[in-house]
Design a protein with these regions (language model features):
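N-terminal topogenic module of multi-pass integral membrane proteins
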Residues: 1-56, 145, 160-199
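Membrane-interacting alpha-helical segments
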Residues: 128-131, 158, 162
Length: 199
């Protein structure tokens, strides 16, 4: 977890440090999971506040939906990592992924937004291979931290190497208000689906 990739300050190491000290038995697994979820929520809050300050109200509303429904998350510490055992949360993960990439498109250059497609796909590839959605959030935290370091360290290189005019032109429609409202509707439905499926 930590700061959003692309912020000028380095990604926060607290999520990774928390995992290490939990594995070492310094803090309990239950407390660690609770703290990590709150770090996650603070990160989402930071993003939606940024969108609100920039006047991107549809995107800020999307972030608000994701933040509000994040309280559905319930984690369990297992061995040396944590899982979210409810399969229903796949809907929330999908909504979160859409929201986060939308944030990237609106706040970063097009090459960096393209880079974050791979970053956001990483935890999905993990669960596709393992057929287990439980560790999705753990893997998202790992990819988030690693990508944040790459983003900040190699931002210039990424902007040069991933510059594709075709992608820039085709993705421009995402900034339209009508598109943002459609994304708001889609993310809201996914998050509500997680709520209903969880029962």
């Amino acid at each position: 977890m930590g700061r959003l990739p692309g912020s000028r300050s380095a990604p926060s190491p607290w999520g990774r440090i928390l995992i290490v000290i939990t594995v070492l038995g310094v803090v309990s697994g239950a407390l660690s999971v609770t703290i990590m979820f709150w770090l996650w929520r603070l990160n989402i809050l930071e993003a939606l506040v940024k969108d609100a300050k920039e006047g991107r109200w549809p995107s800020a509303l999307i972030g608000t939906v994701v933040l509000a429904t994040s309280f559905l998350l319930e984690g369990v510490w297992v061995g040396d990592y944590f899982i979210v055992p409810s399969a229903a949360m796949i809907f929330w993960y999908a909504g979160y992924t859409i929201w986060h990439w939308n944030f990237c498109v609106l706040n970063f250059t097009r090459p960096l937004a393209l880079f974050h497609i791979a970053v956001l796909a990483a935890p999905w590839l993990f669960v596709a291979v393992t057929q287990d959605f439980g560790p999705w959030m753990m893997e998202r935290g790992n990819s988030f931290t690693f990508a944040g370091c790459l983003h900040i360290t190699f931002e210039g290189w990424i902007n040069q190497r991933l510059k594709y005019d075709a992608f820039a032109q085709k993705s421009a429609f995402l900034e339209r208000r009508s598109t943002q409202l459609l994304i708001l509707a889609a993310v809201s439905l996914l998050c509500l689906a997680a709520w209903f499926a969880q029962g």
